């Protein structure tokens, strides 16, 4: 696999604990060709500042939002805002925790083009990655 085919996920906790060191490491990873995503976006100490200043390629919408968005209009509004904001910043968006077709359809209508969850596949052990169809690998972040 090429570095560009892999995503490195960084959590906000890592950023808070060691912001300068983490930033330097993210720059090095991106320079090496890896894609970097901010994981669990919307939870913890989410800050729009991270989106503006970090060398990242995208964000991952936390499953706590996608799991309840269809039943909670406020969460749905928050989820819908993330792809719009990301598009303005030229960032990709991955929605986590997609278990049902109606969730995926709603996310697609909101502008989310990548997703993870049991709707697509259960977690796969590293030794079985080579057995996945090639079409799944680019969106596996």
What is each PLM-predicted segment?
Residues 5-20, 32-141:
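EAL-family c-di-GMP phosphodiesterase catalytic domain
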């Amino acid at each position: 696999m090429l570095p560009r085919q892999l995503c490195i996920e960084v959590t906000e906790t890592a950023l808070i604990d060691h912001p300068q060191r983490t930033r330097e490491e993210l720059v090095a990873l991106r320079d090496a060709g890896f894609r970097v995503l901010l994981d669990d976006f919307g939870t913890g100490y989410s800050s729009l500042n991270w989106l503006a200043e970090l060398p990242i390629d995208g964000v991952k919408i936390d499953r706590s939002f996608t799991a309840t968005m269809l039943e909670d209009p406020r969460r749905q509004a928050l989820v819908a805002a993330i792809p719009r904001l990301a598009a303005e910043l030229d960032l990709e968006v991955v929605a986590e925790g997609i278990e049902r077709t109606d969730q995926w359809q709603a996310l697609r209508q909101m502008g989310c083009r990548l997703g993870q969850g049991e709707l697509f596949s259960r977690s796969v052990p590293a030794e079985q990655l080579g057995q996945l169809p090639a079409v799944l690998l680019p969106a596996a972040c």
